[in-house]
């Protein structure tokens, strides 16, 4: 079994959300998908026009469906852990919108040469995480593929009047990040055996942790905007929030939580290609303080798998929200910045 575990991450070219389409390539594809104004369904409350985390479709005045799908290649050598992380990552999009997950459909690509016991462990990990979220597996789909892939399509519910989008940040708000960054660097390092499974444990725990607590607490207190940090990295998803909200974000580089060993690995150029793709696409919208070195700069573009929530909340409620999250969560959230006015003297993202 140990040999099989170590093979798992060797069976694909990329790891997790680092294997997503680059932002440039995705933009080229999506520009051809145009929905004419007269064809828009008024019940589709949230679509893909602002790069939000999930789609939201109104069913009645007090209920809407939240729908999302996410799957990817292995981010851990242990099949069960991979299943947990993949499910947590998919569920996160519903949590980011302030929704409650209800049902899930498994999506699995698998080669019969690997062994059915490995797939069974992956599905078990996913099932346990979905159960932890209070959702139910309703079915799934499998297909033969040389690369192992697993993920989940999730359906949740939300009150239409309480949808939290990535485009509601307000000037004066405080920014809270609920998980440390660096998972892309660490999964890459594990894949090429720069680090051991023991050194990967922090990243494994962070990625397998549901964003349930952060979501529940932000719904209780009321927030302006939220998104989860995944394949486009902290800067990419922060930019989507800023652009969608028509504001600028000022982020303190010293406040951003980063997992252990990440910067040392980046110094050795051990990071996924997705970090460079993110940098290429988003750098024109970012201003960096001169004090920030290249290692730190690249780390902020690192594509995350099952990353934390980036929450924009009124400054008068920020400390209370932070305390409420941290009282319940082993992984500590941090205040990392604030929302400011976008003007001719700044850019949408300003790292100080």
Cite the ranges covered by each PLM segment.
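Helix-biased detector of long, well-ordered alpha-helical tracts
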Residues: 1-352
């Amino acid at each position: 079994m140990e040999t099989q575990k170590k093979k798992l991450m060797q069976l694909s070219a990329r790891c997790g959300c680092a294997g997503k389409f680059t932002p440039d390539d995705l933009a080229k594809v999506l520009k051809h998908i145009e929905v004419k104004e007269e064809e828009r369904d008024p019940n589709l409350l949230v679509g893909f026009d602002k790069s939000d985390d999930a789609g939201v479709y109104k069913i009645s005045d007090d209920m809407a469906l939240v729908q999302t799908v996410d799957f990817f290649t292995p981010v851990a050598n242990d099949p069960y852990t991979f299943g947990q992380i993949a499910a947590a990552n998919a569920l996160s999009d519903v949590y980011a919108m302030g929704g409650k997950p209800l049902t899930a459909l498994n999506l699995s690509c698998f080669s019969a040469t690997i062994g059915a016991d490995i797939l069974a462990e992956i599905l078990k990990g996913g099932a346990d995480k979905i159960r932890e979220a209070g959702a139910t597996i309703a079915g799934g789909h499998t297909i033969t593929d040389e690369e192992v892939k697993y993920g989940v399509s999730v359906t949740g519910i939300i009150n239409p009047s309480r949808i939290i989008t990535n485009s509601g940040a307000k000037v004066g708000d405080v920014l809270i990040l609920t998980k440390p960054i660096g998972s892309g660097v660490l999964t890459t390092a594990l894949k090429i055996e720069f680090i051991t499974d023991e050194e990967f444990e922090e990243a494994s725990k962070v990625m397998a942790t549901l964003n349930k607590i952060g979501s529940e607490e932000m719904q209780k207190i009321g927030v302006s905007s939220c998104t989860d940090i995944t394949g486009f990295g902290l800067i990419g998803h922060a930019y989507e929030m800023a652009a969608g909200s028509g504001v600028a974000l000022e982020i303190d580089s010293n406040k951003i939580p980063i997992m252990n060993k990440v910067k040392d690995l980046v110094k050795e150029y051990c990071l996924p290609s997705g970090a460079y793709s993110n940098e290429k696409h988003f750098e024109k919208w970012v201003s960096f303080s001169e004090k920030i070195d290249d290692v730190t700069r690249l780390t902020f573009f690192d594509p995350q798998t099952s990353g934390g929530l980036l929450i924009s909340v009124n400054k008068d409620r920020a400390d209370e929200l932070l305390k409420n999250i941290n009282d319940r969560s082993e992984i500590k959230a941090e205040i990392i910045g604030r929302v400011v006015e976008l003007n001719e003297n700044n850019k949408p993202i300003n790292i100080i």
